[in-house]
Amino acid sequence: MNKKLVIVLMTAGLAQGALAAEVYNKDANKLDFYGKAVARHYISDNTAVDGDATYIRLGFKGQTQISDVLTGFGQWEYNFQANHSEGGNDAQNGNKTRLGFAGLKHATLGSIDYGRNYGIIYDVGAITDTPVIFDDETYISADNFMTGRGGGRLTWRNNDFFGLVDGLNVAAQYQGANSNSTNNPRSATRSNGDGYGFSLSYDTPWDVSILGAWATSKRTTAQNALLLGDGDRADIWATGLKYDHDSVYLAATWAQSQNMTPIGSLGYANKTDNLEVVAKYLFQNGFAPEVGYFKSKAKDLELTGDQDIMHYWDFSLVYYFNKNMSVYADYKLNRIDKDNNLGIASDDQTGLGLTYQF
């Protein structure tokens, strides 16, 4: 396996659509199509996890050259579950739009886009979102304020700080309310009030990156009525450090949140401390072992005081046949106490999979 392919594989594991196929490129318009077919099976004593987990994911990225300095762009991504019946009550479970946004990019001023996109905190969280299966990030989840994927987001990004400082990247994001008082009502634990946040990162010349992000959002009346958690705002800050050179990838993040981390349907933790560490190496023969450690401790819970709400080691091994095909196994060693009072699953999990991506 040559050095160029090693770099491609490491990048593909971290960036959605890194292997996209170009389907149209004419008259200053370009359209790339990407996706993957994931054949996957989980083994666990937890019946909510054990079994088939096969899915298909498809998306496109398009751009149009408006002028010498201005480009328009858009992206859409959808997930199709392939482990359900045809036409039964479960047929549509898990089928969902993951991303959908459009924007403009200026050569110097940066890009601005609006729609369903990743939250500003994911600028940090992405560097440890690397386990092949069990990437249950401690402080990142979809439709959870400004952390994971979510809707109604206006995002501005500028790389290399207006062309003045190589490697210095800044971003700002605003999110409008999504709740029962808007045109897209949802459950309390999927809702959010108006919020905003910022991120800053610096890629050094020595393959080391330093990252930081902060966000704050209004909480809804329904959220404050839940059993756990209380407060007008949900706040979070996160920092990260990454080393990425050829076959070696090392990353760690630390984050602290207030009134933001959900605990099932019970509500939110008043405060959490979150640590994530990953280490990965890609051998020239195509094997890529990875070890990860993830821990989230909730503080001052109304029912139980301080308690781990996520705590596990992750051990995975991937074999890349080429840049498009891989087979893998992932083991989640759960360290959550079996007798915890919040009903958090404590079972270990094993995942096996075969993925074709383009």
Please name every model-derived segment.
Residues 1-21:
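Gram-negative bacterial Sec-dependent N-terminal signal peptides
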Residues 22-43, 47-177, 192, 201-204:
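Outer membrane beta-barrel
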Residues 29, 49-56, 95-98, 148-152, ...:
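Residues that define the transmembrane beta-barrel architecture of outer-membrane proteins
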Residues 35-41, 74-78, 116, 172-176, ...:
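Transmembrane beta-barrel strands of outer-membrane/channel proteins
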Residues 59-61, 101-104, 155-157, 199-201, ...:
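Outer-membrane beta-barrel architecture
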Residues 66-72, 108-112, 162-170, 206-212, ...:
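Repeated loop/turn-to-beta-strand initiation elements of outer-membrane beta-barrel proteins
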Residues 154, 319-321, 346-358:
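Outer-membrane beta-barrel "beta-signal"
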Residues 191-315:
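Detector for outer-membrane/organellar transmembrane beta-barrel domains
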